[in-house]
Amino acid sequence: MQPESKKQRLQCEFYMEKKKRRCGMSRNLSSKYCSEHQILNENTKRIPCPLDPNHTVWESDLDSHLKKCNKLKLIHQHDNKPYFLKDCNAITTEDSNTTVITKDSLQNWIMKTIPVLKNFFKDDEKNYLSNVPLDIRKNHTMEDKRFPQLNENDNIGKKYHAIQQSSLIQNMIDRNILQFKENSLANFIEFGCGRAELSRYVNQVVIKNSEEKIYNPHFILIDRSTNRMKFDTKMKKDALEFNQNLNPPTITRIRIDIKDLKIDPLLQKDSKYIAISKHLCGVATDLTLRSLTYNPDDNDFLQGVCIAMCCRHVCNSNNYVNPDFVKSIIGNTNTEEQLPYDQFFHALTKIAAWATSGDRPTSSDENNTHFTNLPYTERQELGLMARRVIDQGRCDWLQQKLGESFKVELIRYVEPSISLENVALLAYRK
């Protein structure tokens, strides 16, 4: 019996002049060239993938690619999920993100926005700080556990994160957002959770203070990105380490954009819930506030909110929760030419970045080339003013939505030397 002949390999037909031979790579039956030399085929070209322009495909392979593209799986990963509702927390307009803003236009808007800010704070130039109290607190349970793990060789940033988490947790405890009564806590939702570090330390503190009590929490971790070195498994191990009589927490991690998130299908029925986040970036804060108030019936079970905000420079006028507050500031200014809301707000976000642009002047200050001709210290103060306007609008909006049974306030939970992004929004029952 004769052995079967080997199937003939299809070799790339590209001829390499320098080596005086054909390319040694394999090709498809339908092509003359391998993938490396396919670009030489005049009948094919690379085009952006319609599902994700960040990568390209051969035009001839488009149909087959669309059936297996990873982006397709991501687009449909939440199909028929009860917690998914497209753009339920976002406000979209036809002209969103279509206007090209030139450098000159932006600088012009900023120069017109600066006097409006100064006018708003003219009665008390430090009003933007004095009305946001510095409320630094320490949680000894968290610090006794975490600080010994941070030796002198660790990145100082790790200790700064721990200090921030300690203050946020103790501020929640002192306002009865975190309680330690039997069955008093069931749902924790961390928005923009990343690795879920804040949830882990909240979990540890509640476990430590729930000895001899029933503890069966549900942590709902929300983030639109994938994350490495997550704390999900460690949160379950912490329960056994701190108290072996307690059940480990239930953890639900969902990769989803907050703009599409309905939280009520995720909550345990008739159980209280707490919303937390540390350094929730830009517009994500506005989307989160809308998510929390999307179904007014959920307010009956809301125990509290703790959101440490950041990155106001990436907020946008369409999705900001309280445009009326900003419009009232524009309208109360006696200027010859008032900017439209969208232009004013865009300038406001850029000015807000000046509050966190470092602790010393830049080269543009040394050369006196900054387009505002303002010194660094004055720009930093204007940045704090702009940030205060954005935060106060959110605070007022949430207070209106939650009603008289809640108190909503802003605090500075650490010194600027620990974090320049040190303002948190707290909501708790009176």
UniProtKB/Swiss-Prot annotation:
<keyword id="KW-0963">Cytoplasm</keyword>
<dbReference type="GO" id="GO:0106050">
    <property type="term" value="F:tRNA 2'-O-methyltransferase activity"/>
</dbReference>
<keyword id="KW-0862">Zinc</keyword>
<feature type="binding site">
    <location>
        <position position="69"/>
    </location>
    <ligand>
        <name>Zn(2+)</name>
    </ligand>
</feature>
<dbReference type="GO" id="GO:0002128">
    <property type="term" value="P:tRNA nucleoside ribose methylation"/>
</dbReference>
<dbReference type="InterPro" id="IPR039044">
    <property type="entry name" value="Trm13"/>
</dbReference>
<dbReference type="GO" id="GO:0005730">
    <property type="term" value="C:nucleolus"/>
</dbReference>
<dbReference type="InterPro" id="IPR021721">
    <property type="entry name" value="Znf_CCCH-type_TRM13"/>
</dbReference>
<dbReference type="InterPro" id="IPR007871">
    <property type="entry name" value="Methyltransferase_TRM13"/>
</dbReference>
<dbReference type="InterPro" id="IPR022776">
    <property type="entry name" value="TRM13/UPF0224_CHHC_Znf_dom"/>
</dbReference>
<feature type="binding site">
    <location>
        <position position="49"/>
    </location>
    <ligand>
        <name>Zn(2+)</name>
    </ligand>
</feature>
<keyword id="KW-0863">Zinc-finger</keyword>
<comment type="similarity">
    <text>Belongs to the methyltransferase TRM13 family.</text>
</comment>
<dbReference type="Pfam" id="PF11722">
    <property type="entry name" value="zf-TRM13_CCCH"/>
</dbReference>
<dbReference type="GO" id="GO:0008270">
    <property type="term" value="F:zinc ion binding"/>
</dbReference>
<feature type="binding site">
    <location>
        <position position="55"/>
    </location>
    <ligand>
        <name>Zn(2+)</name>
    </ligand>
</feature>
<feature type="zinc finger region" description="CHHC U11-48K-type">
    <location>
        <begin position="46"/>
        <end position="73"/>
    </location>
</feature>
<keyword id="KW-0479">Metal-binding</keyword>
<keyword id="KW-0819">tRNA processing</keyword>
<protein>
    <recommendedName>
        <fullName>tRNA:m(4)X modification enzyme TRM13</fullName>
        <ecNumber>2.1.1.225</ecNumber>
    </recommendedName>
</protein>
<dbReference type="GO" id="GO:0005737">
    <property type="term" value="C:cytoplasm"/>
</dbReference>
<feature type="binding site">
    <location>
        <position position="65"/>
    </location>
    <ligand>
        <name>Zn(2+)</name>
    </ligand>
</feature>
<keyword id="KW-0489">Methyltransferase</keyword>
<keyword id="KW-0949">S-adenosyl-L-methionine</keyword>
<comment type="function">
    <text>tRNA methylase which 2'-O-methylates cytidine(4) in tRNA(Pro) and tRNA(Gly)(GCC), and adenosine(4) in tRNA(His).</text>
</comment>
<dbReference type="Pfam" id="PF05253">
    <property type="entry name" value="zf-U11-48K"/>
</dbReference>
<dbReference type="Pfam" id="PF05206">
    <property type="entry name" value="TRM13"/>
</dbReference>
<keyword id="KW-0539">Nucleus</keyword>
<keyword id="KW-0808">Transferase</keyword>
